[in-house]
Amino acid sequence: MSIILGIDPGSRITGYGVIRQVGRQLTYLGSGCIRTKVDDLPSRLKLIYAGVTEIITQFQPDYFAIEQVFMAKNADSALKLGQARGVAIVAAVNQELPVFEYAARQVKQTVVGIGSAEKSQVQHMVRTLLKLPANPQADAADALAIAITHCHVSQNAMQMSESRLNLARGRMR
């Protein structure tokens, strides 16, 4: 059993999603958004750090998965996004959580089956995969999708390792 915290970073809204994985079974534990209503960036970063730390304390995840930085049209926005990611990662590292990063395209490909999927498609598939009564808010859905991606990637990596081990054992006999 593993608990995975997914984070969709943003300097104004940071989405989070928490799921439990037992084998191939995924269970929704919680999701939401850390909203920073202050104007100055240092105060927003402090709120993100505190919010992520609180979520980690509440859910006690085993893994921390976060979206990688993408190239934004606006350099200032990209820098702020990078800083928001940074404080979220520091919150995880301070709690000794292993950190995994996934590209947005990989997350969409894993959850929807199309790397260029729309936000509404991600919301719908997250709702379906986690058997939720309604679509989660967009940023929370993205965070849940990141957590789901981590489950799929780690499950596939484990299966590949087992296959290689079995193959090696077969050669030794």
Swiss-Prot record:
This is Crossover junction endodeoxyribonuclease RuvC. Belongs to the RuvC family. The gene is ruvC. PROSITE patterns: RUVC. Pfam families: RuvC. The keyword Hydrolase applies. One of its GO terms (biological process) is DNA recombination. The active site is at D8, E67, D139. It is found in: Cytoplasm. InterPro entries: RNaseH-like_sf, RNaseH_sf, X-over_junc_endoDNase_Mg_BS, X-over_junc_endoDNase_RuvC. Its cofactor is Mg(2+). Binds 2 Mg(2+) ion per subunit. Its EC number is 3.1.21.10. It catalyses: Endonucleolytic cleavage at a junction such as a reciprocal single-stranded crossover between two homologous DNA duplexes (Holliday junction). The lineage of its organism: Bacteria, Pseudomonadati, Pseudomonadota, Gammaproteobacteria, Enterobacterales. GO terms for molecular function: crossover junction DNA endonuclease activity; DNA binding; magnesium ion binding. Transmembrane segments: none annotated. The RuvA-RuvB-RuvC complex processes Holliday junction (HJ) DNA during genetic recombination and DNA repair. Endonuclease that resolves HJ intermediates. Cleaves cruciform DNA by making single-stranded nicks across the HJ at symmetrical positions within the homologous arms, yielding a 5'-phosphate and a 3'-hydroxyl group; requires a central core of homology in the junction. The consensus cleavage sequence is 5'-(A/T)TT(C/G)-3'. Cleavage occurs on the 3'-side of the TT dinucleotide at the point of strand exchange. Homodimer which binds Holliday junction (HJ) DNA. The HJ becomes 2-fold symmetrical on binding to RuvC with unstacked arms; it has a different conformation from HJ DNA in complex with RuvA. In the full resolvosome a probable DNA-RuvA(4)-RuvB(12)-RuvC(2) complex forms which resolves the HJ. Mg(2+) 2 binds at E67. Signal peptide: none annotated. Keywords: Cytoplasm, DNA damage, DNA recombination, DNA repair, DNA-binding, Endonuclease, Hydrolase, Magnesium, Metal-binding, Nuclease. It comes from Salmonella paratyphi B (strain ATCC BAA-1250 / SPB7). GO terms for cellular component: cytoplasm; Holliday junction resolvase complex. Gene3D superfamilies: Ribonuclease H-like superfamily/Ribonuclease H.
